[in-house]
C-alpha cells in the first residue's frame, strides 16, 4: 500500500503524506524548523536567513556533495508555530507542513506541490524522510521500490515519472 496520495485539484499536482508521530506539536515543530534536528531526517541542510522562520525569509538548501552537487533556494510563505510551515523549495515546488494535535502526539501532513513528472520521485523520497523523522529503519533499496509503486499509481493520472537527476550519487540513482 502506498503512503503518499496525489492531489490534482490545484494549479500543480501535489503529493501528500501523513504521519502520526508520538511527540506533541511543539516538539515536532522543532524537528521541522531547527537546523540540527532537520539534519537527522531532511534530505539536505536547511539554512534560514537570520535563523528565524518568518514570512519572506530566504532559505538555502545545500545538498551534501557526496549525494549531489546542488543548492536550492526558497522563501518562507507561512509560519504559524506550532501549526503550519510552508516555503518554496527551489523554483518549482512548495512544501507545506501541517501539524495537528492527536492524543499525546501529532499528525503531520506534508504536501509537496510540484512538477507532474516529479511526483513519484518526491513521494518516494519524502516517505523515506518521514520514516527517518519517525525513527523507523530505512532499507537500502526502499526508495527504488517506492518509486516503482508510485510511478505505477501516478502515471495514468499525470503522465511519465522521472527518477533522480543523472548527477545524483545516492542510493536512489537512476537506471
Role assignments for model-derived ranges:
Residues 2-8, 103-175:
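Terminal "cap-and-tail" regions of soluble proteins that handle hydrophobic small molecules
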Residues 28, 38, 59, 76, ...:
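Hydrophobic pocket/interface hotspot
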Residues 16-17, 35-71, 82-84, 141-152:
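Short beta-edge strand/loop motif at the mouth of beta-sheet-based domains
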Residues 12, 67-69, 90-92:
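Glycine-centered tight beta-turn/hairpin loop motif at sheet-sheet or coil-to-beta transitions
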Residues 1-45, 169-175:
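Hydrophobic ligand-binding cavity/cleft-lining segments
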Residues 19, 72-78, 94-101:
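Hydrophobic/aromatic beta-strand elements that line small-molecule binding cavities or substrate pockets
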Amino acid at each position: 500500500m502506498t503512503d503518499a496520495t496525489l492531489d490534482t485539484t490545484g494549479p500543480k499536482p501535489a503529493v501528500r503524506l501523513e504521519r502520526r508521530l508520538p511527540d506533541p506539536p511543539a516538539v515536532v515543530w522543532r524537528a521541522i524548523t531547527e537546523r540540527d534536528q532537520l539534519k537527522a531526517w531532511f534530505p539536505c541542510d536547511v539554512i534560514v536567513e537570520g535563523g528565524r522562520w518568518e514570512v519572506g525569509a530566504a532559505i538555502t538548501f545545500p545538498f551534501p556533495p557526496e549525494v549531489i552537487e546542488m543548492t536550492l533556494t526558497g522563501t518562507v510563505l507561512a509560519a504559524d508555530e506550532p501549526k503550519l510551515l510552508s516555503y518554496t523549495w527551489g523554483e518549482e515546488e512548495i512544501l507545506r507542513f501541517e501539524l495537528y494535535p492527536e492524543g499525546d502526539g501529532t499528525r503531520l501532513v506534508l504536501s509537496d506541490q510540484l512538477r507532474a513528472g516529479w511526483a513519484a520521485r518526491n513521494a518516494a523520497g519524502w516517505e523515506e524522510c518521514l520514516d527517518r523523522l519517525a525513527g523507523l529503519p530505512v532499507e537500502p533499496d526502499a526508495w527504488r521500490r517506492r518509486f516503482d509503486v508510485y510511478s505505477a499509481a501516478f502515471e495514468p493520472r499525470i503522465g511519465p515519472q522521472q527518477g533522480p537527476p543523472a548527477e545524483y550519487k545516492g542510493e536512489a540513482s537512476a537506471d
